[in-house]
Amino acid sequence: MKNKVLGRRCIAISLAAALSAGLTACGSTGGDTQAATTETTQITETAQTAERIYSLTEENENQELTMARQPESSYWFPSELLSWDAKTDEDLRFNVSTVPLSERAAREHLQTVNSTQNKETNIMAISIMNSSTSGNPPHGLNKVNANTFTYWQYVDTLVYWGGSSGEGLIVPPSPDVVDAAHKNGVRVLGTVFMPQTAHGGKMEWLEDLLVKNEDGSYPVADKLIEVAQTYGFEGWFMNQETEGTDEEPLTADHAARMQQFIQYFKEQAPDLDLVYYDSMTVDGKMDWQNALTEENLAYLVSEDGDPVADAMFLNFWWTSDTLADQELLKKSAALASENGINPYDLYAGVDIQSEGYNTEIKWDLFENEEGGTYTSLGLYCPSWAYTSADTIQNFWKQENKLWVNSMGDPSADVKKLSNTQWKGISSYIVERTPLTSLPFVTNFSTGNGYSFFKNGSQISLLDWNNRSIADIMPTYRYIIENGNGNKLSADLDVADAYYGGTSLILRGNMAKDTSSTIKLYAAELTAADNMIYTTAAKAKGTEITLNAVLELEDGSVVTLEGDQNVGEEWTVVSYDTSSIIGKTIKSISYEITSAEDVSGLQLRFGNITMMEADSEENAAVSNLEVLDSEFDEDGMYAGVRLAWSSDIAADYYEVYRVNQDNSRSLLGVSNTTSFYINTLPRTDDTNKSAFEVVPVNAALEEGNSAQVVMDWPDNSLPKADFAADVTLAAPGTKITFESLCSANTETVNWTFAGADIETAEGESVSVSYPEEGIYSVKVTAVNKAGSIEKEKEGYIVITSDAADGLVLLSQGAGTEADAYVNENEAPEFAVDGDVSTKWCATGAAPHEITLDLGEVNTVSAVDIFHAEAGGESADMNTKSYTILVSQDGNSFEEVYSVTKNTNGTTHNAFTPKDARYVKLVVNKPTQGSDSAARIYEIEVY
């Protein structure tokens, strides 16, 4: 999604009154992905707050590298969950949400901004917040791409959608998502996903889920409760779609046990939510009702009238042409009321995963005669706005149209749209607000960026995402009243920020002395007698007068004049709040005025602060330690787990590398007392890196920091290796050799005995062999510390029999595998010559597939087409695999091994061998923790 490229540079910046510049050493490039470990030396010291010089952190040049021991958000199969123990979970400190659920203003106090909004309808968003079930860092990484959702004001409950038969079925939300949601007053649910058989579902998993102990307890339910309470989220979404097989059918007994499971869960944890998906009926059939009916009513209320689940998400087909005349939502509301169920505990499902706001919905089936809705609304995959976008700006644009409306103004009238056109969620849902108590501080941060700004100065070019430090965004996106001759529009901006990576920007033209007003926030804030109210802004094009316009609870509107105009540099404007002490603020707007005509105005908002004077304390960090460190095999990149103590909770903990010149380079910002540094580049030859953690409060004041030193492994000597594109060839054939020497290699020397060029230098060399024979090849890696040789004896076979090139031997070969998902993904599809079909095996790795070539042949290469070659995500490409050959099918010899692949297609040439059987062992099936092997084709030559 990144749409700009910045060159590597290191510029020292001081955030004192004057900026001073200096040069620092830039890091090295390169590095492999095979993890290696070494001892670390930890030296902790306390550093007092002082003026710091900041070296501009360079861009991450190795985004594809992920260290093996990166902390990971959790996921389990049911039986695995039973073995989970928080006390021994090394990732626990990274996976716990630390942001409490914010209290929102009461519904009856909310103000509607258009004629179709109502206060009763709830909304549930089932969203893909991370692209896969596994491999998700708890608090982001040094990448900008992330679903940094920003329309929380329209959501009451977020379901963190995940689960797959190849990774895990029980998926708690990652803590960064919970933190962002809680900050906005949104409840978050994890997912319990029982997939259909076609998607790898197994009845044994459902049986594991529903196991009941002799004492009447349900062990998996107890674990679900423990996970939610330990990690700090509000409950679970139950998605049971495993329909069974003829041999293992789904029955009414499963349905009854599911109801009992849910009741037990609610008895043990009444404060946690459990939402049931309209799928399995009470008679044990997979029969989506698309409504509340007698077939699924028992999942909400038992025959005895006892409550079961808290709510139900209704399937999507109530709006289809075939079911429209049944008015299923109207009937659902009626049946709910008859049984003492709040109709707004039913969520009418709308599937927008494929088409987003282009999805046609018969909204009249959702709307009732009183101007409200029959049920609440459930959106499946509003994450479409992110996954279908090619730039971050397009993501914001699509998100705005999806959640607000096509006019980008929640106060706009959408009645003129046709019945099936997308009206925007703001047409039904009144905006919620968590602004109910001081302090209120926003830096307009979306939780990601292409760089990081501190007090308005750019201190890092490192891409980043961490939704845990996202801010509360404007409630109204956007309501602007332009004065005569003015034309301003609003959006988010990644080019500049006050703190974080984004700001709010207004662009357009203004007439002299003519005001425009932008309404930003709904609130229910009582002004304290010592309240500080400031706004950081900057204007390009002219100076701007920026007055605050506050609507009060009694309906009056107060305009507070700023103490200074806004110029081209970040300006912190203060407002005197003495006239509103003790009064309740209902909305926050700004009046913008220019003293001259201006076109091309750019007005950025970087921070709004409302807090009681002296209410923010400064934290002190201590006990900073390196919990764990690992290094790539070249010792050029590190993955580092840091943890520390803090005497009081800080809003932010800034993590820096301390450079040799004592300047600081920002590595990231955390809201917890731990942080993971991924792919930290080695920047010098001292074999040490010092880190500093600086606590920062909501007023952006620094507390006392702490430092620690980590040791790097000695990687002074290079490592030598190489590969050839062909190892079996005819005389005179050009063969290309590629160096696989380590990144610290300065010179690569080659020896080709018997070739037309017998010695050479360079990363890549092409030679030919004029005579038939078997030849060895040697490479020497050289740097200032010394040299290392690697020789492969008998590596090249030259024969006239290869004059017509390599022959494909494997198409249609016999196959045997240790596992496969179903008959549509059986092992024979790996040799059918079609890259749109695959062999897929689930369960714990490694996975094996063996090809029978029918007779003994000379084999010298195997091409493998991984997930990406078949159209799947590159994250699903096989990372580690081994190729073995055999003449008898019993005794196998390893001929090739890969530990760090990221490519969708791999060519693996090795010393020619006589073999009938070729075995592929998939050791690490994906780039993350997904254990499903996906091989679209294997070609043996």
Protein language model regions, located:
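Short carbohydrate-recognition loop motifs
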Residues: 486-516
